C-alpha cells in the first residue's frame, strides 16, 4: 500500500511539470546523470533548477575552495564555508532541496581530469561547463563531441549571459508546437469517418439532437453540400469562407416565427471553419526529415528514431496514401456525450490502425537490419506516430568549427550587425576578453587600478580578433569600456536568469521534448533582450 501513496505524493509534488512533459518525460529526467563543472553562482543556479524538478543525479566537478567572492554572489554558499571545498559545500546544500536526488562531487579541476582521466566525462548524459577558460572548454568540447555526449556551455560575464549547446544530433519527437492545427482530415476523409458522417441526417433530426451534433460533423455535412452546389475545391479565399459560413448559418433551426434558434454547436462550427478547412498535407520540415540521409540509408547503428521515421515514410507511400498517420485526437466541443464519444472513437480507432501499419513497417526494417523486434517499444511507436507532423531534428556545429578560422560563420555575424547594438556584439566582446585572458593570464578590469590601462589592451584584442576573422564590422568603444568595468564579475541576478534558461534547455535535451535553440544564446542585462545565433 506504500507504493501508491508514494506515487500520489510524487504526483502532487511534480504536478505542474508532469502536465508539461508527462510521466515518460519525468522518467527520463529521473534516470539522467548530469555533470556540472564549477559550483559558481551560475553553476549552482543551474543545478537548483534541475534538482527541484527531480533530476536523477548530479556530479559537481570543482577543485576550488570557497572564497569571500563566492559567498558574496552565491546564495548556496555561506560565510562558514570559506576555505572549504566548493564542490562539497554546494552539493550538500543543493541536496537539501530534494531528497530524491543523488548529489556527488569531485574535488578536481576539469583540467586535471582532462589530463589524467578524460574517460571520466563519458559516464554522464550531459555535461554543463560554467565559467571555464577558452582553452579548457575547447578541449572538453572536442572530447565530448567525439564521445557523442551533449555539452552546454553557460557563462555569466557582468551583465551578459552566454549559452552554447553542442550536440551532434538531437531528434525531438514531442516538439509541442504553439497553435498546432487539429488533424481532422475533412478534406481527405478515411472511409470510417465518411460512414460516420453519413449516419447523421440534419434535415430530419429533432431539436435536441440537432443542437447536440458535433461541429466537425456539421462542417463535414455542409462541405459535401458545398462540393455539390458551389465548387469541387475547398473554400480558400476570405470570400469563399464567408460564403461557406453563411451556408452553415442557413442550417440553424428556426422557430415558428422564423427566428433562428440559439444553436451553439452551429455557432461553434462557423467559428471553426478555418480550423476545419485546413489542408491535409505533409509539412515541409517533415519532408526534409524523410529525405535525410539518416532516414534513407539505415544501418545497424541507426537509433530507434530514424527507424521509426523510415517506417512512417513507408506508411505514407503505401497505406497512408500520401498522408501521415492520423493523430487520433479531437478538440472538446458542444455535443452530447454519446455523439462526442462515437466521433472520438472513429478517430482513435483509425489512429490505432495507422500505428499498427507503421509498426509492421518498423518490424520489417528491424528484421532487415538484424535488430531485435523488441528494440523499439510500443510506447515509442505510438508517441512518434501521434507526433509525426511535429518531428524535429537539431544538429549543432562543433565548437572547433565555430572557432576555426576557415569554418567560422562569418555570414551570421555580418548579417546581424546592421544594428550596432545587436546582441552579436556581446559575443564578439566575449571572444575578445577570452583573447585578453590568453595573453595576460587574467580578465580585463579584475583589479580596479588596471581598468583604464586594460581598455586599450582589450580594444587591441578585439581589433586583432576582427581582423583575423575578416570581419569589417564596427564595435562601439562603449562596449570595450563596459566589459572592462565588468571585471569578469558574476552578478547573482544575471546568474539566476541564466541558470533558469540553461536548466530549461537541459531538460529539453534529456526529455527529448520541446525544441532546443541552435546553437548560441546571448542575453543582455543592459537592455533586457536576448537573441540566438547559429555560429
UniProtKB/Swiss-Prot annotation:
CDD domains: APPBP1_RUB. InterPro entries: APP-BP1, ThiF/MoeB/HesA, ThiF_NAD_FAD-bd, Ubiquitin-activating_enz. Pathway: Protein modification; protein neddylation. PANTHER family: NEDD8-ACTIVATING ENZYME E1 REGULATORY SUBUNIT, UBIQUITIN-ACTIVATING ENZYME E1. Residues 332-345 are annotated as: Interaction with UBA3. Regulatory subunit of the dimeric UBA3-NAE1 E1 enzyme. E1 activates NEDD8 by first adenylating its C-terminal glycine residue with ATP, thereafter linking this residue to the side chain of the catalytic cysteine, yielding a NEDD8-UBA3 thioester and free AMP. E1 finally transfers NEDD8 to the catalytic cysteine of UBE2M. The covalent attachment of NEDD8 to target proteins is known as 'neddylation' and the process is involved in the regulation of cell growth, viability and development. GO terms for molecular function: NEDD8 activating enzyme activity. The keyword Zinc-finger does not apply. It holds the Pfam family ThiF. It comes from the Eukaryota. SUPFAM superfamilies: Activating enzymes of the ubiquitin-like proteins (SSF69572). Heterodimer of UBA3 and NAE1. The complex binds NEDD8 and UBE2M. This is NEDD8-activating enzyme E1 regulatory subunit. Keywords: Ubl conjugation pathway. Belongs to the ubiquitin-activating E1 family. ULA1 subfamily. The record marks 212 as: Interaction with UBA3. GO terms for biological process: protein neddylation.
Amino acid at each position: 500500500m506504500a507504493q501508491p501513496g508514494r506515487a500520489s505524493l510524487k504526483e502532487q509534488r511534480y504536478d505542474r511539470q508532469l502536465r508539461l512533459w508527462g510521466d515518460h518525460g519525468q522518467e527520463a529526467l529521473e534516470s539522467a546523470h548530469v555533470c556540472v563543472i564549477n559550483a559558481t553562482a551560475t553553476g549552482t543556479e543551474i543545478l537548483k533548477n534541475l534538482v527541484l524538478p527531480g533530476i536523477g543525479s548530479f556530479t559537481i566537478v570543482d577543485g576550488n575552495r570557497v572564497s569571500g567572492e563566492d559567498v558574496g554572489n552565491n546564495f548556496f554558499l555561506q560565510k562558514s564555508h570559506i576555505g572549504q571545498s566548493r564542490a562539497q559545500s554546494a552539493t550538500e546544500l543543493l541536496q537539501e532541496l530534494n531528497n530524491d536526488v543523488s548529489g556527488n562531487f569531485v574535488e578536481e579541476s576539469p583540467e586535471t581530469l582532462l589530463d589524467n582521466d578524460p574517460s571520466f566525462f563519458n559516464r554522464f548524459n550531459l555535461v554543463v561547463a560554467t565559467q571555464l577558460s577558452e582553452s579548457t572548454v575547447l578541449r572538453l568540447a572536442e572530447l565530448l563531441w567525439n564521445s557523442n555526449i551533449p555539452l552546454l556551455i553557460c557563462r555569466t560575464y557582468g551583465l551578459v549571459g552566454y549559452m552554447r549547446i553542442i550536440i551532434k544530433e538531437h531528434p525531438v519527437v514531442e516538439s509541442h508546437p504553439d497553435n498546432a492545427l487539429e488533424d481532422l482530415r475533412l478534406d481527405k476523409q478515411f472511409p470510417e469517418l465518411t460512414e460516420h458522417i453519413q449516419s447523421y441526417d440534419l434535415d430530419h433530426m429533432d431539436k435536441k439532437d440537432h443542437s447536440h451534433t458535433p461541429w466537425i460533423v456539421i462542417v463535414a455535412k455542409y462541405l459535401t453540400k458545398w462540393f455539390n452546389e458551389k465548387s469541387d475545391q475547398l473554400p480558400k479565399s476570405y470570400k469563399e469562407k464567408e460564403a461557406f459560413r453563411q451556408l452553415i448559418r442557413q442550417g440553424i433551426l428556426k422557430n415558428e416565427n422564423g427566428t433562428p434558434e440559439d444553436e451553439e454547436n452551429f455557432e461553434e462550427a462557423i467559428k471553426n471553419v478555418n480550423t476545419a478547412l485546413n489542408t491535409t498535407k505533409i509539412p515541409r520540415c517533415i519532408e526534409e526529415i524523410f529525405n535525410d540521409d539518416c532516414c534513407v540509408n539505415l544501418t545497424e547503428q541507426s537509433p530507434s528514431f530514424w527507424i521509426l521515421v523510415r517506417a512512417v515514410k513507408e506508411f505514407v507511400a503505401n497505406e497512408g496514401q500520401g498522408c501521415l498517420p492520423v493523430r487520433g485526437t479531437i478538440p472538446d466541443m458542444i455535443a452530447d456525450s454519446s455523439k462526442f464519444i462515437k466521433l472520438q472513437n472513429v478517430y482513435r480507432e483509425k489512429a490505432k490502425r495507422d500505428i499498427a501499419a507503421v509498426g509492421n513497417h518498423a518490424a520489417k526494417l528491424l528484421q532487415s537490419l538484424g535488430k531485435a523486434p523488441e528494440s523499439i517499444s510500443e510506447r515509442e511507436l505510438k508517441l512518434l506516430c501521434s507526433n509525426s507532423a511535429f518531428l524535429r531534428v537539431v544538429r549543432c556545429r562543433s565548437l572547433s568549427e565555430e572557432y576555426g578560422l576557415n569554418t567560422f560563420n562569418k555570414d551570421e555575424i555580418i548579417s546581424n550587425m546592421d544594428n550596432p547594438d545587436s546582441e552579436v556584439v556581446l559575443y564578439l566582446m566575449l571572444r575578445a576578453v577570452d583573447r585578453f585572458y590568453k595573453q595576460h593570464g587574467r580578465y580585463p578590469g579584475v583589479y580596479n587600478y588596471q581598468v583604464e590601462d586594460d581598455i586599450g589592451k582589450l580594444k587591441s584584442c578585439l581589433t586583432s580578433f576582427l581582423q583575423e576573422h575578416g570581419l569589417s564590422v564596427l564595435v562601439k568603444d562603449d562596449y570595450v569600456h563596459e566589459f572592462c568595468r565588468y571585471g569578469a564579475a558574476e552578478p547573482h541576478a544575471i546568474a539566476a536568469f541564466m541558470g533558469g534558461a540553461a536548466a530549461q534547455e537541459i531538460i529539453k535535451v534529456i526529455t527529448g521534448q520541446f525544441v532546443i535553440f541552435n546553437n548560441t544564446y546571448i542575453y543582455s542585462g543592459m537592455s533586457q533582450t536576448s537573441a540566438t545565433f547559429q555560429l
